[in-house]
Amino acid sequence: MNENQKSFDSDKSESEDEQKNGRVKVRSRKTDDNEGYTWEGEYQRSWDIVQEDAEGSLVGVIAGLIQSGKRKRLLRDTTPLQRGIIRHMVLVLDLSNSMEERDFHHKRFDLQIKYASEFVLEFFEQNPISQLSIIGVMDGIAHRITDLHGNPQSHIQKLKSLRDCSGNFSLQNALEMARASLSHIASHGTREVLIIFGSILSSDPGDIFKTIDALVHDSIRVRIVGLAAEVAICKEICNKTNSSTKNAYGVVISEQHFRELLLESTIPPATDSAKTTDASLVMMGFPSKVVEQLPSLCACHSIPSRGGFHCPRCKAKVCTLPIECPSCSLVLILSTHLARSYHHLFPLKNWSEIPWSANPKSTHCFACQLPFPKPPVSPFDESTSSMRYACPSCKNHFCLDCDVFAHEQLHECYGCQCSGN
């Protein structure tokens, strides 16, 4: 009897003994090298990471985890840099068969549509005078989903109408169509491409290195968010087209990381000083809103409406702002759009966290006037955070919610505005 037969008989006898004792041995289909998908780790023995605070309560621990996550998102580089606030971006979606994989809690395709919709809203919230176009790639062919314009609702409607995935992905075809869409952009606007790449291969019809050289010649920046693994050609594309931007290529490790990598592209890129030309004025129009008694066709969509905005140059009516006038090509915006884009040039400084050891005297938040937590009784907790955050300019103390609101929405300090700084 050989060794294989002996091992088989021993396994068989072991299983028979277990069945007699009323125990059934369940064998896992997963090996030690492959313990499961990444999202499953969030639900396996999650009670092991629960820890009580000094008073035996879980409320303080949960609040601390939430606050640490908020603070991590706020700690950004606030160095004032020259940035291109008039942006033109092409968002490329992967609609190949690889997006049917379920290595996240949801399918890659569903997660892509969800976070792409959030990206569109956040992009126009942070860059109101910019324009966006969407391209989808399936069966190795690039399809234009939306044209280059500044209406976020139109982009989201087209995204939600996508259903099918098929074939392979083609980096070269996607980049060539994106380059053709951005070729007519003036020099004062940025040219950017953001690719969601869920495959590990690219079915290209020609030499992609010639396409990379053309992108560098046309000053087009490419950022790629990978969903499967790091691909060498993607890294080379990002390195060659982003001379001043680091970490332009990232591979997601979780659903939250996927969202964070996408939203990083909402911040305008820094301008390369070596390629910067002399500053020039850009002509823009500030139209007046009109309300008509009888509906008339707009110049942008040819849809009858009673209200809109009249171009100050050619008097053509458009539905929404910002937009480029379809008749005279004048950029039509509101003054609030410029104000919302201005904060990227001079970002609000990060507020420092005040520990109990600093003996803070403030009892209420300067902005919302809610009371701060009381000092700890035991000296062991003096090294923990006091839930106070101080502005380096006005020295006032604020709570975490006001800190988040000031940096993500208002982009101004409450104390500095009150003191006139």
Swiss-Prot record:
Q: What keywords does the record list, in alphabetical order?
A: DNA damage, DNA repair, Metal-binding, Nucleus, Phosphoprotein, Transcription, Transcription regulation, Zinc, Zinc-finger
What the entry lists under Pfam families is as follows:
C1_4, Ssl1
- Region feature Disordered, mapped onto this chain: 1-35
GO process annotations (BP) = nucleotide-excision repair; regulation of transcription by RNA polymerase II; transcription initiation at RNA polymerase II promoter
Q: Identify the main location.
A: nucleus
Is Amino-acid biosynthesis tagged as a keyword? no
GO MF assignments: RNA polymerase II general transcription initiation factor activity; zinc ion binding
Q: Which SUPFAM superfamilies match?
A: Cysteine-rich domain, vWA-like
Name where it's found: Nucleus
Bias class Basic and acidic residues marks the residues at 1-21
Which superkingdom heads the taxonomic lineage of this protein's source? Eukaryota
Zinc fingers (C4-type): give the ranges. Answer: 311-328
Phosphoserine found at: 15
Question: Which residues, if any, are the signal sequence?
Answer: none
Any one cellular-component term (Gene Ontology): transcription factor TFIIH core complex
Assembly behavior: Component of the 7-subunit TFIIH core complex composed of XPB/ptr8, XPD/rad15, ssl1, tfb1, tfb2, tfb4 and tfb5, which is active in NER. The core complex associates with the 3-subunit CTD-kinase module TFIIK composed of mcs2/cyclin H, mcs6/cdk7 and pmh1/tfb3 to form the 10-subunit holoenzyme (holo-TFIIH) active in transcription.
The record's similarity note reads: Belongs to the GTF2H2 family.
Q: What does this protein do?
A: Component of the general transcription and DNA repair factor IIH (TFIIH) core complex, which is involved in general and transcription-coupled nucleotide excision repair (NER) of damaged DNA and, when complexed to TFIIK, in RNA transcription by RNA polymerase II. In NER, TFIIH acts by opening DNA around the lesion to allow the excision of the damaged oligonucleotide and its replacement by a new DNA fragment. In transcription, TFIIH has an essential role in transcription initiation.
Q: What name has this protein been given in UniProt?
A: General transcription and DNA repair factor IIH subunit ssl1
Species of origin reads Schizosaccharomyces pombe (strain 972 / ATCC 24843) (Fission yeast)
